[in-house]
Amino acid sequence: MDSSNVPVLKDEDKCKFSMRFTNFLKSRPELKTKPAILNGKRVYYFRVKRVLRFLTSEAYTPKKYKGFPEISSREEAIEVLKLLIMNSMLVRVDKLPPKQRKQKLVELQINRNQDFQDDMHYVWLYEPLPKRVMALAVLFALVVLALVLFPLWPMFMRKGAWYLSMGGLGVIGLFFVLVILRFFLFCITAVIVRPGIWLFPNLLADVGFCDSFKPLWSWHNSKSEVKKTRKSKKLSKKATSPAASATPEKSSTSTTSLKNLRHRNPTVEEVSE
């Protein structure tokens, strides 16, 4: 990148510029970022040609943003991306072959050779804290402060807090009662009506609150599990059938040989003295 277009920045200013420029690029739809998995974490990656095409096009308007450099060539855009790499904003990755046929997210692997060819892929490493998380942190701090000042609360607020705590304990108690009741119901129906019925089958599943109570009931084995068991039984029968068919053939050959021995005509053999 030409030094006339970009001012000389200190280390702190370079870091701030990298964060601002990264947030700007992440918000641009021209990059067409896609979700993927890198080291077990969900990340977003993009192609080099898309970011270079955007930075050298008319869609990139640096005059609207203070401190953004003017970019007129591919080399200048690459220099800006190198600055982002030096500040750990992005890193080059390679796609791994899929482990399954229908894999939802692509798995990535870091490539140490930080080059900028058109078909190469890069991942955003910089993830700023969302405003929602910061708001929740402030709210949590205020709640803790309010609990610490509980002795200074007026009497009506203390009574309200006591009623709320009792209501929360009641909800937790009802949840445990529901878990015990559905277990007893399953044990009874497993004996009377096999394979058994579960009340609120998704109650303990890793789903949302509303989905935990859908459906109202279901059988112990789902349709997919029943199909799998049937297929396994069919495969086991097919595997055992050749061995079973092979044994009668052996027995039939042995019986035919015995019959031939029985119906053979008597013969006289000469014995040399």
Swiss-Prot record:
Keywords: Endoplasmic reticulum, Membrane, Protein transport, Translocation, Transmembrane, Transmembrane helix, Transport. Residues 1-132, 189-273 are cytoplasmic. Residues 238-259 have a biased composition (Low complexity). GO terms for biological process: post-translational protein targeting to membrane, translocation. One of its GO terms (cellular component) is membrane. Residues 225-273 are annotated as: Disordered. PANTHER family: TRANSLOCATION PROTEIN SEC62. This is Translocation protein sec62. It comes from Schizosaccharomyces pombe (strain 972 / ATCC 24843) (Fission yeast). The lineage of its organism: Eukaryota, Fungi, Dikarya, Ascomycota, Taphrinomycotina. The gene is sec62.
